[in-house]
Swiss-Prot record:
InterPro entries named in the record: 3hydroanth_dOase, RmlC-like_jellyroll, RmlC_Cupin_sf
Gene3D superfamilies according to UniProt: Jelly Rolls
E.C. designation(s): 1.13.11.6
GO terms of molecular function: 3-hydroxyanthranilate 3,4-dioxygenase activity; ferrous iron binding
Name of the molecule in the record: 3-hydroxyanthranilate 3,4-dioxygenase
CDD domains, sorted: cupin_HAO
PANTHER family: 3-HYDROXYANTHRANILATE 3,4-DIOXYGENASE
Organism listed in the record: Shewanella woodyi (strain ATCC 51908 / MS32)
Binding site for O2: 46
Annotated keywords: Dioxygenase, Iron, Metal-binding, Oxidoreductase, Pyridine nucleotide biosynthesis
Cofactor note: Binds 2 Fe(2+) ions per subunit.
Swiss-Prot/TrEMBL cofactor(s): Fe(2+)
C-alpha cells in the first residue's frame, strides 16, 4: 500500500489557523523536501527586503497583500489580490506585506542550490539608502528568520543609516508605508 496520499488543503489550513497569525504567521507544509511550500497568514508586516537566490511563486488564497518591490533603485507596490498568482524572479528585492487579518497566501520556492545564500536588507525610510544587509544559508523560513530579525531590531548601530544617519525604526514601519488601495481598478493602471 502506498504511503503517498493527497489531503484537503482547506482542512489543513483550518487545522493550522492558530499558527497563521502573529507572532508565528507562517507554516511550512512539508519538511525535508526540495520545495519550500509555505502558508502565510495575515496580519503580517515586515520592514526588510528579501534577496532570494531562487524564484518564488505567490498564490493569494484569501484577502489581499502588497509585495513591495525594488526595481532600478525605486520601491513600488505590487498588489496581489485574492485569487491572484505572481511569479517573482530570483534576486528581485521584495518585502511581502499582509495587513489584512485573516488573509492567507501560499508561497512556493525551490530548495536553494548548495551554497546559495539568501539576503535580508533594510533600507532607510528617509533617504532610501541601504542600512543593513545579512546573508544566510536558509534552511527553514519558519526557524531561520526570527533570529535574523531580532538581531537587527536590537542593534542600534546596524539600524543607523550610513548615508544620512537616520535610525531605522526596526520592526514597525512608518505609518502609511503599507496601504491596500480602496479602488482595486487602480491596480490595473
Amino acid at each position: 500500500m502506498s504511503k503517498l496520499a493527497a489531503f484537503n488543503f482547506q482542512q489543513w489550513i483550518d487545522e493550522h489557523q492558530h499558527l497563521l497569525k502573529p507572532p508565528v504567521g507562517n507554516v511550512q507544509i512539508w519538511e525535508n523536501t526540495d520545495m519550500m511550500v509555505t502558508v502565510v497568514g495575515g496580519p503580517n508586516q515586515r520592514t526588510d527586503f528579501h534577496d532570494d537566490p531562487v524564484e518564488e511563486f505567490f498564490y493569494q488564497l484569501k484577502g489581499d497583500m502588497v509585495l513591495k518591490i525594488i526595481e532600478e533603485g525605486k520601491c513600488h507596490d505590487l498588489f496581489i489580490r485574492e485569487g491572484d498568482i505572481f511569479f517573482l524572479p530570483p534576486h528581485v528585492r521584495h518585502s511581502p506585506q499582509r495587513p489584512m487579518p485573516g488573509s492567507i497566501g501560499l508561497v512556493i520556492e525551490p530548495k536553494r542550490p548548495e551554497g546559495a545564500k539568501d539576503a535580508f536588507e533594510w533600507y532607510c525610510f528617509k533617504c532610501d539608502g541601504l542600512v543593513h544587509r545579512v546573508e544566510v544559508l536558509l534552511k527553514s523560513i519558519v526557524r531561520d528568520l526570527p533570529p535574523i530579525y531580532q538581531a537587527f531590531y536590537q542593534d542600534e548601530q546596524a539600524r543607523t543609516c550610513p548615508q544620512c544617519g537616520e535610525l531605522h525604526p526596526g520592526k514597525e514601519p512608518p505609518q502609511g508605508w503599507v496601504t491596500l488601495l480602496e479602488n482595486k481598478e487602480q491596480d490595473k493602471s
